Amino acid sequence: MTDPKKISRVALKGYDLTKVSRALEECEDQPGVRVGGVQIVSGGEAEAPAHLEDNRQGAIGDNFDVFSRDSKNVQIVTEHEDSSDEEYEEARSYGDDSGHQPNRAAVPFADDEYGDFKRARERLPQLFHEGWGFGSQQANEESSEGLQQQSGECGSGGGSSNAGGKDEDDLQEKTGHEKEKSVIVPPKESGSVSGYHGSCDIPFNMEEFLASPATTQRRQLLELCQLIADRSNEELIFFPWGFNLVKRKVHRVEPQQPVAVSHRFTWEDFQLKLKAGFTLIHKKTKAPVVLNSSSYNLGSVPEGGISLSPDDTELSVLIKCLRYLGLYKFLATQIEF
């Protein structure tokens, strides 16, 4: 398989690095192939069609260049010295003739359904591929610090999606070493997060996540929790290993002046609270978020609440929160194909 370091800049653009790597691998034996919405085209950079050249996203290593054709497809032009124009044209049409339809995997956040996507788009590539604990310890610490610094800049929306690439170049120039990139892969069994809001993939590699140290897991989930707060402006942020639990007072609270009380719980405290039962209120819908050990099925709470069991794991709590907050489209990488 192609060395992921050679396609690190694809990760900075938010593309699924594993799918790109697999596509590049298959391209070695075929003139062109489409894998998960990423089309591989044999030919040199000079032969790239004009409409791709005008929308060039940036080089990814010595032999590959990425071009964005439209919001639903990305072409990667691989450089082969002996490629002819005919071979290149054949490769260009390969994906369209193969029966595979363009997939959103390459540009997973193409729809602006929530309106306030600019800030999220700028931050997601960095969060997905630098700050989730699968890279080097140095990269994790740096991204964690950067995330904390960014948490107070929610309203600015400044910066560019190219910032990650610049940071990488600066780091490489100073240290002489290429910054290690993290690979986030959707779980193989996506059915575990289906239903309620619909099928989706949470951007976790389950095996790597569960095999990583507890401190790494918690750091990853904390970063996602902060991302949720920025994205949805929710006061519903409850994670049981010591993060802040924001509990809205239900009685006599004006929507314009919400009253929130912050508590800090351990996982054991959280389980005790589950047994006792307590209620949180969704900031926007005002629907109750039911944390009740007597009910485990999300579908049993038609108002849109979350029902948890003391047997829930940290990850299952996270997934239920994501589904409840309606972030499945925001955080999903793709629907399985």
UniProtKB/Swiss-Prot annotation:
What does UniProt give as GO cellular component?
Answer: host cell cytoplasm; virion component
Which organism's genome codes for this protein?
Tupaia virus (isolate Tupaia/Thailand/-/1986)
Q: Where in the cell is it found?
A: Virion; Host cytoplasm
Q: List the disulfide bonds.
A: none
Q: How does it assemble?
A: Homotrimer. This trimer is stabilized by binding to the L protein. Binds N(0), and N in ribonucleocapsid.
Q: Where is the composition biased (Basic and acidic residues)?
A: 90-99, 172-182
Q: Does the keyword Chaperone apply?
A: yes
| Region of interest: Disordered | 77-110, 136-194
Task: Recite the UniProt keywords alphabetically.
Answer: Chaperone, Host cytoplasm, Phosphoprotein, Viral RNA replication, Viral transcription, Virion
Spell out the protein name for this chain: Phosphoprotein
Modification after translation, per record: Phosphorylated by host kinases. Phosphorylation play an important role in facilitating trimerization and possibly P-L complex formation.
Question: One GO biological process from the UniProt record?
Answer: viral transcription
Q: Which domain of life is it from?
A: Viruses
Cited function: Essential component of the RNA polymerase transcription and replication complex. Binds the viral ribonucleocapsid and positions the L polymerase on the template. May act as a chaperone for newly synthesized free N protein, so-called N(0). Plays a role in virion assembly.
| Gene from which the chain derives | P
Magnesium listed as a keyword:
no
